[in-house]
């Protein structure tokens, strides 16, 4: 089992020193879901929400969140992201919105937290914009789908998960 990288020998939290690591292309994808009543989802799909375009706002929020992950999550490195993408898809058959984020850079540390933050904040933005209509929406699950690049190797969620 791997050791926790953000805990030093004395058991104290610390920021990992990545200065000796090689720069590689790193990429991560994450997903989140927001489940709601069919009427709420229909309002988002047909664009009749009084606050405007819910998907456009959530997309921008997710992109902005990825860029600011280092300010939100202690011990994360500030990263020079080369790409952030947030896709939102209505899934009427499940009364939910699926959010998928992609983050990429060439650097010394991974972008998993940025991808997870992008998907999470996009989901929170959907909730915020729709809470006047429905307060019992459910956010989740939120998970890492894949990562590539770096010393720890590649990871991909099993297609059956």
Curated annotation (Swiss-Prot):
Keyword RNA-binding attached: no
Keyword match Lyase: yes
Recorded metabolic or biological pathway in which this protein acts: Cofactor biosynthesis; molybdopterin biosynthesis
EC supergroup of this enzyme: lyase
Reaction(s) the record says it catalyses: (8S)-3',8-cyclo-7,8-dihydroguanosine 5'-triphosphate = cyclic pyranopterin phosphate + diphosphate
Binding site for substrate: 75-77, 113-114
Keyword entries, A-Z: Lyase, Molybdenum cofactor biosynthesis
Superkingdom as given in the UniProt entry: Bacteria
GO molecular function: cyclic pyranopterin monophosphate synthase activity
Enzyme Commission no: 4.6.1.17
GO BP annotations listed: Mo-molybdopterin cofactor biosynthetic process
Active site: 128
InterPro entries according to UniProt: MoaC, MoaC_bact/euk, MoaC_sf, MoCo_biosynth_MoaA/MoaC, Mopterin_CF_biosynth-C_dom
Cross-referenced PANTHER family: MOLYBDOPTERIN COFACTOR SYNTHESIS PROTEIN A
Assembly description: Homohexamer; trimer of dimers.
HAMAP family: MoaC_B
Function: Catalyzes the conversion of (8S)-3',8-cyclo-7,8-dihydroguanosine 5'-triphosphate to cyclic pyranopterin monophosphate (cPMP).
UniProt family annotation: Belongs to the MoaC family.
NCBIfam families in UniProt: moaC, PRK09364.1
Protein name as annotated: Cyclic pyranopterin monophosphate synthase
Lineage start: Bacteria, Pseudomonadati, Pseudomonadota, Gammaproteobacteria, Enterobacterales
Gene (UniProt): moaC
């Amino acid at each position: 089992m791997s050791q926790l990288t953000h805990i030093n020998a004395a058991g104290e939290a610390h920021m990992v020193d990545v200065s000796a690591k090689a720069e590689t292309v790193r990429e991560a994808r994450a997903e989140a879901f927001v489940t709601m009543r069919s009427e709420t989802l229909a309002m988002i799909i047909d664009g009749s929400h009084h606050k405007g375009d819910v998907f456009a706002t959530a997309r921008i929020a997710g992109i902005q969140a990825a860029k600011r992950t280092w300010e939100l999550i202690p011990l994360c490195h500030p990263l020079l992201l080369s790409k952030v993408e947030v896709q939102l898809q209505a899934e009427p058959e499940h009364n939910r919105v699926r959010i998928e984020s992609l983050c990429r850079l060439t650097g010394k540390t991974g972008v998993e937290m940025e991808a997870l933050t992008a998907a999470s904040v996009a989901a929170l933005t959907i909730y915020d914009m729709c809470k006047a209509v429905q307060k019992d929406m459910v956010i989740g699950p939120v998970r890492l789908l894949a990562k590539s690049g770096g010393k720890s190797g590649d990871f991909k969620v099993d297609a059956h998960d």
